Amino acid sequence: MLKKNKIKVIISSIIILLPALFGIIMWNDLPDIITTHWGADGNADGLSGKVFAVFGTPIILLIFHFVCLLFTSLDKRQKDQNQKALGMVFWILPIISLFTNGIMYRAAFGKEFDLAFFMPALLGVMFIFIGNYLPK
């Protein structure tokens, strides 16, 4: 699966790392401590240094992306899977990376974001997409 989808792997990996590029460009404007985690109530409850926030979170997501791709490609039953479902494996983490890092940078620049309102809706949309492509 990975050999015939090399371009997808490269493009999805670049998309996951795009927030790090934004962080490098905006490095001097970012505060030294950045909110990287919010509780279920939408309040910030986790802070990280600028280096981890800019580089660590995209790298962790990239590693997780590679692990998901590896396990999916090693699955003997993946040939029987719907190709759209397999394609979702390539694009879930890039979308999550852009969204979560976008929220993180938005908070770093002092912009409000009502996470408690949007997260249930976004999780619902994600489950709808996943539910439509899982085998029955």
Question: Where are the regions a protein language model picked out?
Answer:
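Feature 926 captures the class I aminoacyl-tRNA synthetase adenylation module centered on the KMSKS loop
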Residues: 2-34, 39-136
